[in-house]
Regions:
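Small-xxx-small helix-packing motif
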Residues: 11-12
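Short helix/strand-capping connector loops at secondary-structure junctions
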Residues: 128-147
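A general, composition-driven signal for non-globular sequence regions
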Residues: 21, 26, 140-142, 152
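C-terminal or internal capping secondary-structure element at the end of a domain, subdomain, or sheet
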Residues: 143-171
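Short, compositionally biased, intrinsically disordered N-terminal export/targeting signals
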Residues: 2-8
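Short, low-complexity, charged/polar segments at coil/turn and helix-coil boundaries
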Residues: 5, 17-20, 24-131, 161, ...
Length: 171
C-alpha cells in the first residue's frame, strides 16, 4: 500500500494548545486554511514531478484485458482533497488519485513512487513470467522534502489568515 508522508512541526504542541483555546469554528477555519495551502503546494509540485511516458503504451490488466494508456494519465488522475472529520487532526488535506478515472491508473502510483523489485508472476493457466522490476521515480516525497520551509511558512500564514478572516466577520 502507499505510504503516508507527513511533517513534524517544531512548536506544534504549543500551536495546538493555542488553537484549542479558540472557539471551535475559528479553530477549524484556521486549521483548514493552513492545511489547504500546504497541500496545494505539494500537489502542484508532485504533479510536475510525475514521470510521463513518451507515447501511448499498452497494459494488460489482471483479468487479461489489454488497454492503451496515454502519457500524463497518472498526473491527470492526481487530486487534492479535504478529509472531513479527520481523527486526531484539526484539519487534513491529502494528495491522492481519483479512483474512477483513467482506467484505474491510481493503482500503480505507489509502484512508480517506490519502485518494484524483480519478481515472478504466475498466470491463471500456470505459465510463469519474471517481471524485471523497475527503479523508483519518486514524485511525492521530493515535493514534500524540497519545500519543507515553504510548507511551514504556508501553515503559519494560513492559520494567521484564517483567524483574521473569522475575526473580520465577527466585527
Amino acid at each position: 500500500m502507499a505510504k503516508k508522508t507527513g511533517l513534524k512541526i517544531d512548536g506544534a504542541a504549543e500551536l495546538g494548545k493555542l488553537l484549542q483555546s479558540l472557539p471551535e469554528k475559528l479553530r477549524k477555519k484556521a486549521a483548514r486554511e493552513a492545511t489547504r495551502r500546504a497541500a496545494e503546494l505539494v500537489f502542484k509540485q508532485a504533479k510536475a514531478n510525475i514521470r510521463r511516458a513518451d507515447g501511448a503504451y499498452r497494459v494488460t490488466l489482471k483479468g487479461g484485458e489489454t488497454i492503451t494508456r496515454q502519457p500524463g494519465e497518472l498526473a491527470d488522475a492526481m487530486i487534492m482533497t479535504h478529509v472531513p472529520e479527520a481523527k486526531s487532526y484539526l484539519s487534513q488535506h491529502k494528495v491522492t488519485f481519483a479512483r474512477k478515472k483513467h482506467n484505474d491508473v491510481w493503482k500503480i502510483a505507489h509502484f512508480i513512487e517506490s519502485g518494484v523489485n524483480v519478481h515472478r508472476i504466475t498466470s491463471k493457466n500456470g505459465q510463469e513470467y519474471t517481471h524485471p522490476g523497475h527503479r523508483a521515480y519518486p514524485f511525492l516525497k521530493p515535493a514534500v522534502s524540497k519545500n519543507k520551509a515553504q510548507i511551514y511558512r504556508l501553515i503559519k500564514d494560513g492559520i494567521g489568515d484564517g483567524m483574521k478572516d473569522v475575526l473580520k466577520k465577527k466585527k
